[in-house]
Amino acid sequence: MDKIKVGLQYWIPQHALTRLVGKLASARAGSLTTAIIRWFIKQYNVNMDEALHSDPTHFKTFNEFFVRELKAGVRPIAEGEKVITHPADACVSQFGAIEYGKLIQAKGHTYSAQELLGGDAKLAEEFRDGDFATLYLSPRDYHRVHMPCDGTLRQMIYVPGDLFSVNPLTAENVPNLFARNERVVCIFDTEFGPMAQVLVGATIVGSIELVWAGTVTPPRGNTVYRWDYPANGNQAVVLKKGEEMGRFKLGSTVINLFAKQAIRFDDSMALGAPTRMGEPYAHQA
């Protein structure tokens, strides 16, 4: 059955389906929208007690519900200049060392940092022998993505690709999943060196938005695009630890890359462990 589920993803019109779901999720359908939201909350056991607006009727579209804001204080940001915090509510899919330019996708599967970063060999070299963490956001999770540390944006890269599901089953069965799916790569300069925060798209992920650029995708295309940002001045993008940096409209995966000997993972990190935005997950080495 698992092979059938994975096999079907090669045959379905991923981009057309995603466009359709994106339009439906943005539609203002009144009581129908509310009914769908109520069903989703029950189906996925969504904790609405943490939401700033807990009444499903508050949301005019499904997307508004999906990127719901949390109440102030429910995700305190761990203090300490050397403390690196989880960027999202998720679970730990994989984490560890980048060895020979490769990251672990799942047991028996690896992929290259260079491919993940849009084929940029020079950029991948900055993370040689570094560390990575892959965090999977499930449907029930809070879907805004935050900064794990203070950072100044250096570059943003849009990489077109497939839109496979990114759940654990697919990660275990689709080679190069994260390096073949559509993604937005954000490179930040930090006090402990370069950091990549990669937002990976998936089937029915209607859009990826960033606070400094708005909606990056859609529209979708076949060309890798790069934007460079200054370190200073009016065009600089400087974000503090815990600040929102982006969001998924229907969720997906966040991947962090760190330079060699820049960090050490917190003892709480474990495969499959749930994460809460703002809690520690690494420390500056």
Swiss-Prot record:
Chain positions found as Pyruvic acid (Ser): S252
Uppermost EC category: lyase
Annotated Gene Ontology cellular component terms: plasma membrane
PTM field: Is synthesized initially as an inactive proenzyme. Formation of the active enzyme involves a self-maturation process in which the active site pyruvoyl group is generated from an internal serine residue via an autocatalytic post-translational modification. Two non-identical subunits are generated from the proenzyme in this reaction, and the pyruvate is formed at the N-terminus of the alpha chain, which is derived from the carboxyl end of the proenzyme.
Names of required cofactors: pyruvate
Membrane-topology annotation of the record: Peripheral membrane protein
Compartments where located: Cell membrane
Cofactor detail note: Binds 1 pyruvoyl group covalently per subunit.
Keyword line: Cell membrane, Decarboxylase, Lipid biosynthesis, Lipid metabolism, Lyase, Membrane, Phospholipid biosynthesis, Phospholipid metabolism, Pyruvate, Zymogen
Pathway assignment: Phospholipid metabolism; phosphatidylethanolamine biosynthesis; phosphatidylethanolamine from CDP-diacylglycerol: step 2/2
EC number: 4.1.1.65
Keyword Cell membrane carried by entry: yes
Example GO biological process: phosphatidylethanolamine biosynthetic process
Entry annotation: catalytic residues: D89, H146, S252
Catalyses which reaction(s): a 1,2-diacyl-sn-glycero-3-phospho-L-serine + H(+) = a 1,2-diacyl-sn-glycero-3-phosphoethanolamine + CO2
Site (Cleavage (non-hydrolytic)): G251, S252
NCBIfam families, per database record: PS_decarb (TIGR00163)
Subunit structure: Heterodimer of a large membrane-associated beta subunit and a small pyruvoyl-containing alpha subunit.
Function description: Catalyzes the formation of phosphatidylethanolamine (PtdEtn) from phosphatidylserine (PtdSer).
Annotated family: Belongs to the phosphatidylserine decarboxylase family. PSD-B subfamily. Prokaryotic type I sub-subfamily.
Name of the molecule in the record: Phosphatidylserine decarboxylase proenzyme
Organism, scientific name: Vibrio cholerae serotype O1 (strain ATCC 39315 / El Tor Inaba N16961)
